[in-house]
């Protein structure tokens, strides 16, 4: 029996069903690489970021995620080289899909029990996404933003449902906008942490705080 089409598993039904000691014999997810390109680039090198954002609540199989990653990665390498971007898959396929195999040959009713005991066995894995979930992100320099948009548009075609490609106002993969990042960097309140940053908070004696100066 061949693999069932992914449209059979597109709608999320029931509770999440992850791999566990009660759920064994699960095949590995097809996607194994979640970061591509120049992964070790510092946060300063790629200030612009483009996302694929989901517009539906659905399940996306690991095969679709891997196909999208390959399409985006190949397009970016072709046009801007492998050292000019950092591509990241933002969702993980934890949910296990099941199949209750049915025979379709003559005399199948003698060989199987039909819908009796129809819980099914593990078939593959899928990621559960909501409206507004970010599926893929790529950070680049300003001249390469148009190539990032084109690459993620090609990757978007590998998914079911509706998605959109958006250019974020954030600095790279951080939670800060580019204006906030520049201001905090000038104030020397940022500590680089790989592709992200840590913000140094206000610490010290209470006399420094504006609130206690007014009392």
Curated annotation (Swiss-Prot):
NCBIfam families: PRK04199.1-4, uL16_euk_arch
Recorded family membership: Belongs to the universal ribosomal protein uL16 family.
Claim: Ribonucleoprotein is one of the keywords in the record: yes
Signal peptide positions on this chain: none
UniProt protein name: Large ribosomal subunit protein uL16
UniProt-annotated stretches for the region Disordered: 1-22
UniProt key word Ribonucleoprotein: yes
Alphabetized GO MF terms: structural constituent of ribosome
Keyword annotations from UniProtKB, A to Z: Ribonucleoprotein, Ribosomal protein
């Amino acid at each position: 029996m061949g693999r069932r089409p992914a449209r059979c598993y597109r709608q999320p039904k029931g509770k999440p069903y992850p791999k566990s000691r009660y759920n064994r014999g699960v095949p590995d997810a097809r996607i194994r690489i979640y970061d591509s390109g120049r992964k070790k680039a510092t946060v300063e090198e790629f200030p612009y970021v483009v996302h694929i954002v989901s517009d539906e609540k659905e399940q996306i199989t690991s095969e679709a995620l891997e196909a999208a990653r390959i399409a985006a990665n190949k397009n970016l390498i072709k046009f801007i080289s492998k050292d000019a971007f950092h591509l990241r898959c933002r969702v993980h396929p934890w949910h296990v899909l099941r199949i209750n195999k049915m025979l379709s040959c003559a005399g199948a009713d003698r060989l199987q029990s039909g819908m009796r005991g129809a819980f099914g066995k593990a078939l593959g894995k899928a990621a559960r996404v909501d409206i507004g979930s970010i599926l893929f992100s790529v950070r680049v320099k300003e001249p390469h933003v148009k190539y990032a948009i084109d690459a993620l548009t090609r990757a978007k075609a590998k998914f079911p449902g509706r998605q959109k490609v958006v250019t974020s106002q954030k600095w790279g993969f951080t939670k800060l906008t580019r204006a906030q990042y520049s201001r905090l960097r000038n104030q020397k309140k940022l500590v680089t942490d790989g592709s992200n940053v840590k913000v140094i908070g206000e610490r010290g004696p209470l006399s420094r705080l504006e609130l206690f100066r007014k009392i």
